[in-house]
C-alpha cells in the first residue's frame, strides 16, 4: 500500500510517483507534484528574518498600493509543467510579487520580463499586473533562488541554502527543460548548486557568469546568464533592451531548433 500524507492545504501527497502497475503507487503527473511543491513553498516559514520582513512590508504597504491587499507570503513558481525553458530569478520584490503573489508581477522587472517572453512566444501577453489576469505561459517555467522578499533585495547565504531544496525538487519534476536562463549572479549560482553541477564540475570548468554567457552542460542542457532586469541595471544602461532581447532570442532559438 502506498504511503499517503497531506500537504498543509489538505491536498494528498504520495511519497513517490509510481509506474501505474499493480502493486505500485498510483501514477502521478509531474504537474500534480509541482502543485504540491508550490503549496509547500507558500506555507514555508523557515527563515525568521524573511518572514518578519515580508509580513512587515505587507502591513505597512507602499503609499501607492495602500488600498490593495498584499500577498505577504512566500511566492510560488509558475508556468508550463512541460516547459523546455526555465527562468531563474533572484527573489520576490517587496512591493512587486510580495504584493501580488506571483513572480515578476507588479514591478518594473516584471514589465521587462513579460514583454520579452511575449515577444519570443513564451507568454500570451506583454503586460501582467495581477496574478488573476489570466496570463498564460507556454513552454516556460519561472522560479527563483528565494521565494520570500528579502530586505534590500538580497537574501543571505543561509536563507538561500534553506530555500534551495525547493529548487532541487522543482528541477527533478521539470523533466523537459533544455535551456536555463539565470537572471543575475545569485540565480546563476543557485541553479548550479541545485542542479548539482557546482559540486560535480571543477571550479575552472563551471560556466562563467556574464551577460549573454552561454554554456552547454554535460547533460546537454544549455545555461544562459543575464544581468537581472532590476532598475539598478535598466535605469543605468548596464542592461539595455537589445542586450535583454538577445538572451531570449537565443533561448528561443535553442528551444525551437534543438541547436546547441
Put a short name on every predicted segment:
Residues 6, 16-20, 223:
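Hydrophobic residues within membrane-embedded alpha helices
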Amino acid at each position: 500500500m502506498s504511503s499517503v500524507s497531506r500537504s498543509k492545504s489538505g491536498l494528498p501527497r504520495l511519497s513517490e510517483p509510481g509506474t501505474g502497475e499493480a502493486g505500485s503507487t498510483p501514477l502521478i503527473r509531474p504537474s500534480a507534484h509541482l502543485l504540491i511543491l508550490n503549496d509547500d513553498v507558500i506555507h514555508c516559514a523557515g527563515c525568521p528574518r524573511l518572514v518578519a520582513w515580508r509580513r512587515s512590508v505587507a502591513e505597512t504597504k507602499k503609499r501607492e498600493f495602500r488600498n490593495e491587499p498584499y500577498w505577504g507570503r512566500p511566492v510560488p513558481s509558475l508556468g508550463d509543467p512541460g516547459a523546455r525553458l526555465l527562468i531563474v530569478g533572484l527573489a520576490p520584490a517587496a512591493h512587486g510579487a510580495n504584493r501580488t503573489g506571483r513572480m515578476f508581477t507588479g514591478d518594473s522587472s516584471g514589465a521587462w520580463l513579460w514583454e520579452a517572453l511575449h515577444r519570443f512566444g513564451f507568454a500570451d501577453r506583454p503586460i501582467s499586473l495581477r496574478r488573476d489576469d489570466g496570463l498564460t505561459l507556454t513552454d516556460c517555467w519561472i522560479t527563483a533562488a528565494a521565494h520570500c522578499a528579502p530586505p534590500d533585495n538580497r537574501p543571505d547565504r543561509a536563507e538561500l541554502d534553506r530555500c534551495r531544496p525547493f529548487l532541487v525538487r522543482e528541477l527533478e519534476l521539470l523533466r523537459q527543460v533544455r535551456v536555463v536562463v539565470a537572471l543575475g549572479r545569485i540565480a546563476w549560482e543557485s541553479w548550479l548548486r541545485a542542479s548539482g553541477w557546482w559540486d560535480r564540475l571543477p571550479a575552472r570548468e563551471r560556466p562563467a557568469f556574464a551577460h549573454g554567457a552561454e554554456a552547454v552542460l554535460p547533460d546537454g542542457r544549455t545555461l544562459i546568464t543575464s544581468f537581472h532586469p532590476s532598475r539598478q541595471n535598466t535605469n543605468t544602461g548596464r542592461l539595455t533592451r537589445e542586450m535583454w532581447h538577445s538572451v531570449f532570442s537565443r533561448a528561443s532559438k535553442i528551444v525551437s531548433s534543438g541547436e546547441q
